[in-house]
Amino acid sequence: MNILLISPKYDSYIVAPHLGLGYLSSTLKKYGHKVKVLDGLREEIVYNPEDWDIVGVSAMSTYFPECCKDVEKAKSYGLKTIIGGPHIICDPEQSLIDSQADYAASGEGERTLTQLASGKEPSQVEGLVYWKDGKPKRSNPDLKSLFEQ
């Protein structure tokens, strides 16, 4: 799968690498996925639907509105979206509603996004919130599988 991970552009004078997206990228590449990380503070974010299967957007509370704008823009190109980060972990269902993303990672994104990118059914992806019948639903993976790794 081809995955674009972004940290939104927001008003800040501090420019530091986004380590969380680096961890995600490394894990996804380990499983054979093509990944690009874009930092909105340093570069222009371009959404090309021919290049990406899904766009992951990180959010801290200070720039959650910018996260929502990036989700909206990615979706306008027909791209699937997943949100994650500290803001989303605090209230994944409401974050999914507010952003209108396709998915929200409610815990450690490395496992969640790797399972989703590998084609696992959303209901079986650990730590995922997704839409079902127009409402946010938390995944309910087979608990036995949690102990098999």
Model regions: which residues?
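Nucleotide-activated donor-dependent transferases that construct or modify glycoconjugates
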Residues: 2-12
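Glycine-rich beta-alpha loop elements in corrinoid/cobalamin-binding modules
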Residues: 24-146
